[in-house]
Amino acid sequence: MEIVTAPHLAVRNEWLALHREAPLQPELPIIDAHHHLWDRQTGRYLTHEFSDDIQTSGHRVVSSVYVQCRSMLRRDGPETLKPLGEIEFASGIAAMFASGHYANALGCEAIIGGLSLLAGDAMQPAIERAIALSGGRLRGMRNPLAWHPDPRVTSSPVTPPAGLAQSAPFRRGAACLARHALSLDVWVYHTQLEEIADLAREIPTLQIVIDHCGGPVGVGPCSERDPDMFQQWRNGMRRLAELPNVCVKISGFGMTVRGFHFAAAETPPDSQMLAQAWMPWFETIVSLFGAERCMFASNFPVDKGMFSYGVFWNACKRLVQQASPDEQAQLFWRTAATCYRLTSVENINDQ
């Protein structure tokens, strides 16, 4: 069991059970484009827990993308190679899902690893080992980048130095990813978006995936209802949208750094409440990037402290009620399938 301190809400299954919903549009295929798995002192979320969430939700989740979270790092060996353990772990989970015994979904069909880009050009041998260990499922890397000068703004067990994405070693590592046709998943706050835009301009062959709506901060010096914060975030996202090698995950609404307070209520939020609260962010992102560059993702179990899996997907489906069938397909599975080169789409019938 891993000892990891993270500023995430505790998952209270008894509280979540106080509100359940039947799935909306249960036939609509879904690729969960961002989730984690771990076994920590604060809780376990592994194959059975993820599979149970999928099955009890009633939604048609056909595939998922595993994203690094420092799970099962190798105990021994060079520090730079310890993240290979997480890739092995996720690949093993993927093999379990591929057996057909779990939720009829291809869980962890794509893997985003955590090799440090600070190794620069020296990443190449490690990347080749990672691809082999993943069983061909490796699609990219993610490094801790979210930094804010105010200590009240925190979202990760690892706080990186300021400006890491601007450093020369990191950018050489990013270029190495591009040479291997691997993407870079990025979790930063809205105050850092210009750094990522600069990186995207410098390496136009690198596919960059912006996690969690571009990290609009709603705590500490910022307020979720602050119009200045919203405009600053929108300006940063607009500059990113101008770059064709950038796409966005619509996710992370249950992170404490976002500033929503649904977890403080006596009962969990319903999907209508969530959709209403999220709509300004959703509409802005889709208007800037287009549905073909946006994908929904659960960010479970991080976001499970604020709402259940089924309610989350119902909220997403409420967000797209005015969207065309093609736009809905883009948001729920096609963008993720294209971005991460997922073969499960061959079996999807979204008609």
Q: Can you annotate each of these PLM segments?
A:
Residues 6-8, 161-295:
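Catalytic pocket-lining loop regions of alpha/beta-barrel enzymes
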Residues 70-71, 117, 145-147, 188-192, ...:
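Active-site-proximal loop/turn and secondary-structure-junction residues that shape catalytic pockets
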Residues 80-95, 125-133, 195-209, 263-281, ...:
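Short, electropositive alpha-helical surface patch
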Residues 2-180, 200, 220-224:
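Mid-domain alpha/beta scaffold segments of enzyme catalytic cores
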Residues 38, 66, 89, 114, ...:
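Tryptophan-centric aromatic hotspots in well-structured domains and transmembrane helices
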Residues 32, 212, 299:
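Acidic active-site catalytic centers that drive phospho-/nucleotidyl reactions
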Residues 1-29, 45-53, 62-63, 283-284, ...:
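Mid-to-C-terminal alpha-helical segments outside catalytic/metal-binding sites
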Residues 97-104, 134-135, 202-207, 243, ...:
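Short helix-capping segments at alpha-helix termini
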